[in-house]
Amino acid sequence: MPKAPAREKVLKKKACTFCKESKSGNVSIDYKDTTLLRKYVSDRGKIRARRVTGNCVQHQRDIAVAVKNSREVALLPYVSTAR
């Protein structure tokens, strides 16, 4: 007896939070805003991927630059290893 065809998973695309907020008001990604940046950094200090955060390309790039600048001035930690 033949197998039934597998159902395709429907992936719901996340909307970029910054694009949604920019329509209502001016939103800036600043390296000094560590509470915002910590949402996009894992507990080990790695920058989360776009597919995880749901950001668009431009805002993900802005977050990456802001996190790197924030690390330079010691507001956020660099990537740590588990020991």
From Swiss-Prot:
Pfam families: Ribosomal_S18 (PF01084). One of its GO terms (molecular function) is small ribosomal subunit rRNA binding. GO terms for cellular component: cytosolic small ribosomal subunit. GO terms for biological process: translation. Keywords: Ribonucleoprotein, Ribosomal protein, RNA-binding, rRNA-binding. NCBIfam families: S18 (TIGR00165). Belongs to the bacterial ribosomal protein bS18 family. Binds as a heterodimer with protein bS6 to the central domain of the 16S rRNA, where it helps stabilize the platform of the 30S subunit. Part of the 30S ribosomal subunit. Forms a tight heterodimer with protein bS6. This is Small ribosomal subunit protein bS18A. It comes from Nocardia farcinica (strain IFM 10152).
